[in-house]
C-alpha cells in the first residue's frame, strides 16, 4: 500500500507532523477546516513568487498562529515589514481572530518537495521542455545531499494529443519504509494545452522516531524511466 497512500499521511506521528494543529468540536470543525483550505489557497496565490514550502496553522485560545516556510523570507516580509503587516490584516479578516505570522527560512530549497514542484510548474508555464526541467531539479537535489528523488509529470506533455505520464528517478525512494524521511508534494502547471500535474518525492535518509539527524543510505547510480515505456519499446 506504500505505492498508493499519501507518503506524508503514511508517516504521521512517526517522522512527520501535521500541517494544521488545533482541536475543534464536531460543530465547528467543518468551518475551521474550510478556513484552513482558503488560507492556504490565498497564501499560494499571494506568495507565489516567494518560493513557499509548508504552511503550518495553529489555533491557540481564540487566536491563530501561521508559520510560513519560505526560501525568500525577505520577499514575504517586504521593506521595513510593510508587506507582512498587510498580509496579517488580510488573514485576520478571513479568520476573524487575531493572527500571528511567523516566517521561517528554508535553508535548502533544492531539497523541499513543494518548492521543487512549484518551480517545475513555473518552468512548464514558460514553455520549458518538461524533461529538462525535471532533470535539472533532480541534479540540484542530489548535488545538495538528497539520497534519492522521483518526479512525475502527467498531462499533455509537450502538447501531444493524448495525455500520458512520465517519471524519472535518481537514487532510491523507499515508499514502504516508515522510518524513511520522504518529502512529498504536488503542483499544477496551467499551460495552453491544459493542466499538467507534477508530483515530487524527495528521500533525505532514514530517521528513527524522535531522531533529528538522518542516516545516509547508499544511492543508486542509475536513473530510471517508466518501466512500462521501456517494456513497450
Swiss-Prot record:
UniProt superkingdom: Bacteria
Family, per entry: Belongs to the universal ribosomal protein uS3 family.
PANTHER family: 30S/40S RIBOSOMAL PROTEIN S3, SMALL RIBOSOMAL SUBUNIT PROTEIN US3C
Lineage: Bacteria, Pseudomonadati, Pseudomonadota, Betaproteobacteria, Neisseriales
HAMAP family, A to Z: Ribosomal_uS3_B
Residue ranges crossing the lipid bilayer per the database entry: none
Stored SUPFAM superfamilies: Prokaryotic type KH domain (KH-domain type II) (SSF54814), Ribosomal protein S3 C-terminal domain (SSF54821)
Pfam families (alphabetical): KH_2, Ribosomal_S3_C
Alphabetized UniProt keyword annotations: Ribonucleoprotein, Ribosomal protein, RNA-binding, rRNA-binding
SMART domains named in the record: KH
Gene3D superfamilies: 3.30.300.20, Ribosomal protein S3, C-terminal domain
Assembly and oligomerization: Part of the 30S ribosomal subunit. Forms a tight complex with proteins S10 and S14.
One of the record's GO molecular function terms: structural constituent of ribosome
UniProt domain KH type-2: residue ranges: 39-107
Gene Ontology cellular component annotations, sorted alphabetically: cytosolic small ribosomal subunit
GO BP terms, alphabetized: translation
Protein's name in the database: Small ribosomal subunit protein uS3
Organism: Chromobacterium violaceum (strain ATCC 12472 / DSM 30191 / JCM 1249 / CCUG 213 / NBRC 12614 / NCIMB 9131 / NCTC 9757 / MK)
Disordered: annotated span: 212-233
Job of this protein: Binds the lower part of the 30S subunit head. Binds mRNA in the 70S ribosome, positioning it for translation.
Gene: rpsC
InterPro entries registered for this protein in UniProt: KH_dom (IPR004087), KH_dom-like_a/b (IPR015946), KH_dom_type_2 (IPR004044), KH_sf_prok-type (IPR009019), Ribosomal_S3_C_sf (IPR036419), Ribosomal_uS3_bac-typ (IPR005704), Ribosomal_uS3_C (IPR001351), Ribosomal_uS3_CS (IPR018280)
Amino acid at each position: 500500500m506504500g505505492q498508493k497512500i499519501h507518503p506524508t499521511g503514511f508517516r504521521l506521528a512517526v517522522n512527520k507532523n501535521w500541517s494544521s494543529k488545533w482541536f475543534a468540536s464536531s460543530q465547528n470543525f467543518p468551518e475551521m477546516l474550510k478556513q484552513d483550505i482558503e488560507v492556504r489557497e490565498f497564501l499560494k496565490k499571494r506568495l507565489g513568487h516567494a518560493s513557499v514550502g509548508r504552511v503550518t496553522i495553529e489555533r491557540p485560545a481564540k487566536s491563530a498562529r501561521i508559520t510560513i516556510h519560505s526560501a525568500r523570507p525577505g520577499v514575504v516580509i517586504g521593506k521595513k515589514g510593510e508587506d507582512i503587516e498587510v498580509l496579517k490584516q488580510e488573514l485576520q479578516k478571513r479568520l476573524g481572530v487575531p493572527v500571528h505570522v511567523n516566517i521561517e527560512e528554508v535553508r535548502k530549497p533544492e531539497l523541499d518537495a513543494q518548492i521543487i514542484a512549484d518551480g517545475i510548474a513555473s518552468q512548464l508555464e514558460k514553455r520549458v521542455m518538461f524533461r529538462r526541467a525535471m532533470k535539472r531539479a533532480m541534479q540540484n537535489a542530489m548535488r545538495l545531499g538528497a539520497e534519492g528523488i522521483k518526479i512525475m509529470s502527467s498531462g499533455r506533455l509537450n502538447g501531444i494529443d493524448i495525455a500520458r505520464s512520465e517519471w524519472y528517478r535518481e537514487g532510491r525512494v523507499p515508499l514502504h519504509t516508515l522510518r524513511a524521511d520522504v518529502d512529498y508534494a504536488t503542483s499544477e502547471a496551467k499551460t495552453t494545452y491544459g493542466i499538467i500535474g507534477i508530483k515530487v518525492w524527495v528521500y533525505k535518509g532514514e530517521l528513527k522516531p524522535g531522531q533529528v539527524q538522518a542516516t545516509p543510505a547508499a544511492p543508486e547510480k542509475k536513473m530510471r524511466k517508466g518501466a512500462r515505456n521501456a517494456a513497450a519499446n
